[in-house]
Amino acid sequence: MTDLAGPTITPNLQLVYVSNVERSTDFYRFIFKKEPVFVTPRYVAFPSSGDALFAIWSGGEEPVAEIPRFSEIGIMLPTGEDVDKLFNEWTKQKSHQIIVIKEPYTDVFGRTFLISDPDGHIIRVCPLD
């Protein structure tokens, strides 16, 4: 049995490595429709929910090529209908390139689709669990 004594630990930072912080900041500012809450040349953090942050980081003064640039980032919306609406909104606009990996489909957890950020990280949009 695992010892669960003491304070609970809650994950409150999702960090992804990027090769170009400025380009990725612009991309996520568009995707999240939010301004970052913390900005440096190598690290930028966006508010998520509660005290959680979503952050992008170069990995150092120069991007480290050996660090994999692959994560799956989840965006959960209230309903499957909202998933379809957001897909249509993102793919019809012309200001930002949206790379569609998989168009909306229904999986075991409901409607979902996949896009890619500029570094190849997968962004999955799906309904709340």
Curated annotation (Swiss-Prot):
UniProt organism field: Enterobacter agglomerans
Source organism superkingdom: Bacteria
Domain VOC: 10-128
Cysteine disulfide links: none
Identification of the protein by name: Phenazine antibiotic resistance protein EhpR
Binding annotation for D-alanylgriseoluteate: R42, Y43, W57
Subunit field text: Homodimer.
Keywords: Antibiotic resistance, Chaperone
One term of GO molecular function: protein homodimerization activity
Outcome of gene disruption: Loss of D-alanylgriseoluteic acid resistance.
Signal peptide annotation: none
Gene Ontology BP annotations: response to antibiotic
Pfam families xref list: Glyoxalase
Protein purpose: Required for resistance to the phenazine antibiotic D-alanylgriseoluteic acid (AGA), an antibiotic produced by E.agglomerans itself, and thus protects the bacterium against phenazine toxicity. Probably binds AGA and acts as a chaperone that works in tandem with a membrane transporter for subsequent antibiotic secretion.
Gene3D superfamilies: 3.30.720.110, 3.30.720.120
InterPro entries from the UniProt entry: Glyas_Bleomycin-R_OHBP_Dase, Glyas_Fos-R_dOase_dom, Glyoxalase/dOase/EhpR, VOC
